[in-house]
């Protein structure tokens, strides 16, 4: 089994750019950024429970890793960068912490490397369970209206929230709930040590108005890039700055 994907072919000799979206997003989330790199072959994935992969279910990150590897193999992708936002960033970090032939580098935007104590894990497990119940039960527009009131989205204005609620409400609540719990931060390993021991470039992007993830970035063994005029979803808030940042990374 493989994940649903869209492909843009580039020129021979360039590594692939493999894009992973955030929770409730889909393969189109990174398209504006990816379109700025026409020479590079690009793979845009739908994660389990999302978009064209909505009917694919996993139990944990190991299941996501298996699907991601099978998908890369199905396209004969042997030389690539992983680029992920939020949930997609966590998927990318988890995947990259196992030996991966052909992985050229890791670029994460606003992805959490993992909780560090049992109390925080239990609190997150309860929180994710409550959200999952709402995604299964309530109208999605109502759930996302509350979802985007969470502190991590504090930089959004009313119009931005309204736009995101409309966009995300196209999803399937039951499959989102399943993926939310399967990839809960409560069940994710703390990846700081394996990321520090890595043998590939690791770049971490976060919006200047994203206080939570700027603090997380300071404690990561990564090259950190602050995206100006942006909050948690930096590539949506300021795509031009993210494109410029990626261009600099990929040229180095």
From Swiss-Prot:
It comes from the Bacteria. Pfam families: Abhydrolase_6 (PF12697). GO terms for biological process: menaquinone biosynthetic process. It catalyses: 5-enolpyruvoyl-6-hydroxy-2-succinyl-cyclohex-3-ene-1-carboxylate = (1R,6R)-6-hydroxy-2-succinyl-cyclohexa-2,4-diene-1-carboxylate + pyruvate. InterPro entries: AB_hydrolase_1 (IPR000073), AB_hydrolase_fold (IPR029058), SHCHC_synthase_MenH (IPR022485). Transmembrane segments: none annotated. Keywords: Lyase, Menaquinone biosynthesis. GO terms for molecular function: 2-succinyl-6-hydroxy-2,4-cyclohexadiene-1-carboxylate synthase activity. Its EC number is 4.2.99.20. Pathway: Quinol/quinone metabolism; 1,4-dihydroxy-2-naphthoate biosynthesis; 1,4-dihydroxy-2-naphthoate from chorismate: step 3/7; Quinol/quinone metabolism; menaquinone biosynthesis. Catalyzes a proton abstraction reaction that results in 2,5-elimination of pyruvate from 2-succinyl-5-enolpyruvyl-6-hydroxy-3-cyclohexene-1-carboxylate (SEPHCHC) and the formation of 2-succinyl-6-hydroxy-2,4-cyclohexadiene-1-carboxylate (SHCHC). Monomer. Belongs to the AB hydrolase superfamily. MenH family. This is 2-succinyl-6-hydroxy-2,4-cyclohexadiene-1-carboxylate synthase. It comes from Klebsiella pneumoniae (strain 342).
């Amino acid at each position: 089994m493989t994940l649903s994907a869209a492909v843009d072919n580039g020129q021979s000799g360039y590594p692939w750019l493999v894009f992973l979206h955030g929770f409730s997003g889909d393969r189109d989330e990174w398209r504006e950024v990816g379109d700025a790199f026409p020479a590079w072959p690009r793979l845009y994935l739908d994660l389990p429970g999302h978009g064209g992969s909505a009917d694919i279910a996993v139990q944990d990150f190991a299941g996501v890793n298996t699907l991601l590897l099978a998908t890369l193999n199905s396209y004969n992708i042997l030389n690539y960068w992983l680029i992920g936002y939020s949930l997609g960033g966590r998927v990318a970090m988890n995947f990259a912490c196992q030996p991966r032939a052909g992985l050229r580098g890791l670029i994460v935007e606003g992805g959490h490397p993992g909780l560090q104590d049992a109390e925080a894990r239990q609190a997150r497990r309860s929180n994710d369970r409550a959200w999952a119940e709402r995604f299964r039960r309530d109208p999605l527009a109502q759930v996302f209206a509350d979802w985007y009131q969470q502190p991590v989205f504090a930089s959004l204005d009313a119009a931005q929230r309204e736009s995101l609620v409309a966009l995300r409400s196209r999803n399937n609540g039951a499959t989102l709930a399943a993926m939310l719990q399967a990839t809960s931060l409560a069940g994710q390993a703390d990846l700081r040590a394996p990321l520090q021991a890595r043998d590939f470039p690791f770049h971490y992007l976060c919006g200047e108005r994203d206080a939570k993830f700027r603090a997380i970035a300071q404690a990561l063994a990564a090259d950190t890039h602050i995206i100006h005029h942006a909050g948690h979803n930096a590539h949506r808030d300021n795509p031009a700055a993210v494109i410029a940042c990626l261009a600099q990374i990929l040229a180095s």
